[in-house]
Structure formats: C-alpha cells, structure tokens
C-alpha cells in the first residue's frame, strides 16, 4: 500500500466511525495505534480523549494540530465508507485533518535524525464545542513550543489551492439566548395576555437592524437568530418564548458594542410591551488572529510545495485554534477540498486527493519552521 493509499484508508476508517466532542475514545485509540506502529513517541499527558505525539530532539519546538471530533449530523453521502454511527458524521472534515497530520508525523519520523529540534503533533478533541484547545493547553501541550500551525479543509477551493492571511482570520463567536416572558392567554382573547410570540417575532426583525444599520459596513458582523421555541398547542398564547442565535465579529470593539445594543433593544421592548426579556450570552472562541510573519512563512512554504496560494478572505466561522494563538504565535491555513456541498452539510464529501500533498506540506513546514526559530 502506498503512502497516499494508507492515509486515505485511515481517513475512511475514521469517517466510518465518527465520535462527538469529548466522546472520541475509539478515535483516540485508532490514532494511538497508527502512531505507535510508525514508531512515534506519545507524550504522557493526562487526557481522556485526544493525544500528543512528538518527533525529534533538542530545545526548539514547533507544533502541528489536527482536530478529531465529528458532528451530530445524519450522513447523506451514500458513500461505501459512510458513517456507521447513526446521527454522527465527519461533516467538517476532521477525519481529513487527522489523516493529514498522521501523514506529516510519519514523514517527520523518517527525517527525525535531520530535524533541528522537536515537532509536537496535537490530535485535539472537542473542537466543535470549542473546549478541546484549552484541555490540551492545561495538559501542557504548548510547553516550550515556539509556534503552532493548523489547517482547515476549504470546500470552496479546488484541490491544490491554499489560502491564509496575517491578522484576523476567523471570528469571535458568541451564543445568545433570550427568554421572553409575557402572559399566557386563550388564543381567542389575546387582550387578556401579553403575547410573547408577537414580541419575540418583532424582536427578531429589529435585531437585524443592529448589524445592517448600526455597524460600519466595512466591519464584519453577523447576528443570526437560529431557534424560536414557544407554545405547545394551537389555541393558547404561551407565557414564554425562547430565542437563540449567534453573533460573529472580528473586532472586539464591535463585538462589545453590538452586545450592549442588543441588550438595550431587549430592555426597550420589554418596557414597551409590559413584558420581561432576559438576555444570556455565552462566549465561544475569540477571533483567530494569525501572526503575520508565520502566515507569510506558511504561504511561502506552500508555494514551494506546489500549491497555488491566495490571500484568504475573512471568515465568520469559529475555530478554537484561536486559543493556541492567544498563547504563542503561529498560523492557521485553508487547503482546498473541492466539495460540492459545504461544511456541516449531510452530503459534504471532500476530495481525498488533498491528503497526501498536505501531509508532505506540513512536514516541510514544521522542518523549515524549526530552522527559523
């Protein structure tokens, strides 16, 4: 079996056996077995899921990171190696990322004697719930590390294309929940109640004006309501309704201004309708900010490796690789996966031809980065 065939085989085994965040027990066991069969050293961190391998010796240390968890999505690809776990799918390509870094680890192991330092390869759990990076950092995965690199497959780019940027790349992620409390009533006698559904509906509409009319159009911001829940029958106005959604920004100043304005609007609506609106915010990862030097370096190495390189657009998705970059410099990059369907879609099907070239790229990137720290 060729190197490429081996990586694709591993990817398909991971794809058939996806596991949700913090449940990646079998995934971790598979990765451990594959790494140990390749002679890799595993660091003795106290982790329930996920693991860290290391190649090389010396004081200089570079890290590579892959995420290993899947999503609660029922797969609809029809592939012969489709998910065997009902309602769970690698719909974000973390099986691809893991296979790439497994390949990079094996390539680095072959050149271990020539490496001018050490490379840590982080197989991180729980990216989808934004907790895994903190778990690895607490375990000590960044100890002595000077720079870190990671990737995401990009379905909108053809295979063989690469993009990154210095500075802000991915967004701040905030989740919000509004609990709108009015007064229940018979549907035929709405005047006897305070219609929480009507209030919630108007609130959804007005919230859109914050992003479109109160923020500079040059600033990136998305405010999306993604869930409305209230009532359980057709002839009763419910007492309460919940709204849930997300705010995405790149600037912390815009983030705080929008959050404050949303709370003001909620308070104003509550007063005007004689109702109560409680607003709860839950912080996800902060904006992912690439180190400009390392982003340029990663792009230069990609060009050497034969990729067609691009300056990436700003991305409003969330990515907890941002947490690593709050501690040490590094760069996150996009590598084309040419899928007709996008990330988190039940028919998402990335092109496996990206895996082996990306493995060679990250091995080359790590080795050259060691020479520049």
Question: For each of these PLM feature ranges, what is it?
Answer:
Residues 3-10, 23, 27-34, 60, ...:
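General structural feature for long, well-ordered alpha-helical segments within catalytic domains
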Residues 1-90, 95, 99, 106-115:
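Acidic/His- and Gly-rich active-site-bordering loop/insert found
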Residues 19, 67-69, 126, 154, ...:
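Active-site beta-loop-alpha junctions enriched in small/polar residues
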């Amino acid at each position: 079996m060729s190197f490429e065939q081996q990586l694709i085989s591993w990817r398909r085994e991971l794809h058939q056996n996806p596991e949700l965040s913090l449940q990646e027990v079998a995934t971790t066991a598979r990765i451990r077995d594959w790494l140990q069969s390749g002679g890799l050293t595993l660091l003795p961190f106290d982790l329930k899921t996920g693991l860290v391998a290391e190649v090389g010796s010396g004081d200089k240390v570079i890290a590579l990171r892959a995420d290993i968890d899947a999503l609660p999505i029922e797969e609809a690809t029809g592939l012969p190696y489709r998910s065997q776990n009902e309602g769970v799918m690698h719909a974000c390509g973390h099986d691809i990322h893991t296979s790439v870094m497994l390949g990079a680890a094996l390539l680095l192991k072959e050149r271990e004697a020539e490496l001018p330092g050490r490379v840590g390869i982080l197989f991180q759990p729980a990216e989808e719930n934004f907790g895994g990076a903190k778990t690895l950092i607490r375990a000590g995965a960044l100890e002595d590390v000077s720079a870190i690199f990671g990737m995401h497959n990009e379905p909108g780019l053809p295979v063989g294309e690469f993009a990154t940027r210095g500075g802000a790349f991915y967004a701040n992620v905030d989740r919000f929940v509004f609990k709108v409390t009015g007064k229940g009533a018979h549907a035929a006698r709405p005047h006897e109640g305070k219609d929480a559904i009507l209030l919630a509906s108007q609130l959804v509409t007005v919230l859109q004006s914050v992003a479109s009319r109160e923020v500079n159009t040059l600033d990136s911001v998305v405010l999306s309501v993604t869930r409305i829940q209230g009532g359980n029958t057709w002839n009763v106005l419910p007492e309460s309704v919940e709204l849930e959604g997300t705010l995405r920004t790149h600037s912390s100043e815009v983030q705080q201004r929008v959050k404050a304005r949303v709370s003001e609007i909620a308070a104003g609506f509550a007063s005007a309708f004689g109702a109560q609106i409680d607003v709860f915010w839950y912080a996800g990862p902060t904006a992912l900010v690439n180190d400009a030097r390392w982003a340029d370096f990663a792009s230069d190495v990609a060009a050497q490796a034969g990729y067609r390189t691009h300056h990436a657009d700003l991305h409003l998705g969330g990515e907890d690789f941002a947490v690593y970059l709050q501690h040490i410099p590094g760069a996150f990059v996009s590598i084309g996966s040419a899928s007709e369907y996008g990330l988190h879609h039940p028919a998402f099907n990335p092109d496996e031809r990206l895996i082996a070239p990306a493995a060679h790229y990250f091995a080359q990137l790590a080795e050259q980065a060691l020479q520049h720290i």
